[in-house]
Amino acid sequence: MHKLLPTLLFLLVTLALRAQQKVIPLYPGAAPGSENWTWSETESDKNIYHSNAIFNISKPTLTVYLPDSSHAPTGMAVIVCPGGGFHSLSIMQEGYGVVGWLQSKGITAFLLKYRLMHIRGTDPYQQENEDRTRKAADTERAVVADMAIADGRQALAYVRTHAADYGIDPKRIGIIGFSAGGVISLATAYEATPENRPDFIGFVYGGMTPATIQAPVPADAPPLFIAAASDDQYDLQLMAVKVYTKWVTAKRVAEMHIYAKGGHGFGLRKQQLPSDSWTDRFLEFLTQQGLLKN
């Protein structure tokens, strides 16, 4: 029983924090392009991995997590994009855990629930596995990925427009994404406007859309932090190297950490591996760039 106590405590704290947060719809009405989506957002751990996941998001939102009272606010904000293959959100280690960690550092965090592919049953992971061999799923995923990227841009615009409401410096607003969420965070650097341009990007074992792969790095591309593991099951460490090469070739600021072990989806999971320390490296990077000011 004592081995379960840390997990139970984490879940209780998470539930308490979630009950206190402000949830903001990203669009005043139905999100553009998904006006006819009728399915309801669901959060459940009843899946093949017994892992808490959110799926069937048709109404994208931002949830605000203000800095902990134990730490002076830094005036910086980070939008957090969990991964999940555009089928679900891996909400614990790449969502709730990440925003809680940022709060503890005096950073205002915004959890982005972006639009996802329609899950026809009750297990998003099972459908994701089945969709790997379903050709129509590739087309659907590409369409939804573009919608999710639009949600990321909309989230950045919201935070910058309302920066004063949250005590945020409008020049220190960034975005971090994990896996599919990294597709979103990286893409926001492209075709950005003054309202939705991120001031920094976290790209953690992320991917790229074909359009992002082909596009030149913008002349004003923000500082980029990259983390991945060499034993990533989806070989996204190779994507990390490609993104890093594109950034430095364009003479833009980038820092990359490729860990020998860690696998895909390490997030905030502690494995007694060097990849556990990526969070420290990320904060150091932000400090060196003059973005994180204690």
At which residue positions do the language-model features occur?
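Short amphipathic alpha-helix adjacent to the substrate-entry channel of hydrolases
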Residues: 91-110
